[in-house]
Every structure is written in structure tokens, then in C-alpha cells.
Amino acid sequence: MDLPISNRARHALSAVVAAACLGVSAQASADDATVQAVWTAKPLHFTFMGFTAKYSCDGLADRMRGILLLLGARPDLKLTPVGCSGGFGRPTQFPGVTGTVNVLEPVGEKGPAPDQKPLAAHWQQVVVAPRGEPLKAAGDCELSEQVKTSILPLFATRNIAYNSTCIPHQLTVGGTQLAADVLVPVPQTEPAP
């Protein structure tokens, strides 16, 4: 059954579709744009307080290093395990890490400080608690919660997507998601020989 559509309605519908397409295009180009950013040192003091998963001090330090690098921390970061009572490789009640992490911060309206060298950066989505590894994400449920509240604020982020059905002492497969857009350096292209 064909419904009669007036020319006015047809033009209005075309205008809405065109505006939506232009809006999506403008948003995509804004997301792809480079921004000027500077490395900023931030102190890190993190203690894991979970009941379901247990970490050794070195295991937590390795896991946190991976998360910090994934979020865009400069690779020269150094973490020191703290609160270690179980010995090397043995689970500890409340393991932690401390150190200084260099993260990218967008250059403000005033510009960079005289001792800071700006570099080109862009926003990139990272997934900290992946949906593709449900058992690993279930074990890291409490860690993901603490990363969201204690680690993400150290970074320039946007579009944070977090969902958790964490229950202490239980693995909830597929119950945790943590993703965010973070600033990362634009890869440097090497000149051709």
C-alpha cells in the first residue's frame, strides 16, 4: 500500500537525513583531528583492595604497567610494588604500586609552559576490560572498578563507557566493561631514505 507523501514532507525528511549525515561527518572529523598536547608527570599511589581476585606484588605491578601503557602513559614509567607481605610471586592481601606516570594533557588556551614541548596527539578508544575475554574481565572486575575511580582521572579522557555487575567473591562472566577515549601521540613518520 502506497501512502501519499506531500512534497513538503518529502523535503523535510530529506533535510533531516542530510543534517544527520552532516552531523555524523562533522563529529567524525572532530574526533580524527589532532590536538596539541604535552607530557605531564602525575604521582601514582594505587592499592588493590579486592576480595575475588588475588594478586602478587609483581603480578599487580605488571598488570598495572599494561593498563597504564594501554591508557597512553609514556613507556618510560617506573612502578614500585608496595604492601608486599607474601614474597615474590605469592598473593598478597593488599598489594599496591607507586611511581610517577607521564600522561598527555591537551594544551590549554594559555599554551604550554616554557619548559614543555608540545606534540601532536589524537583521541583513541581503548578497552581496558574487554568483552572479548569474558573470564579475564570477570576476574578483573574489582580491578576495573578501581582503575575507573583511581587511574582514569590521571589521564585526559572522554566518552567513558563503564558497566559492571561486580559481586565480591563471585565471578560474573561478561559483567564488566571499561572503555574510554584517551589522548595518544600521533605516530611519527620516518623520512624516506
Where are these regions (language model features)?
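Cleaved targeting-peptide boundary
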Residues: 28-36
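Acidic/histidine-rich, surface-exposed loop or edge segments in extracytoplasmic proteins
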Residues: 36-52, 119-135
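Short, intrinsically disordered low-complexity segments
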Residues: 76-108
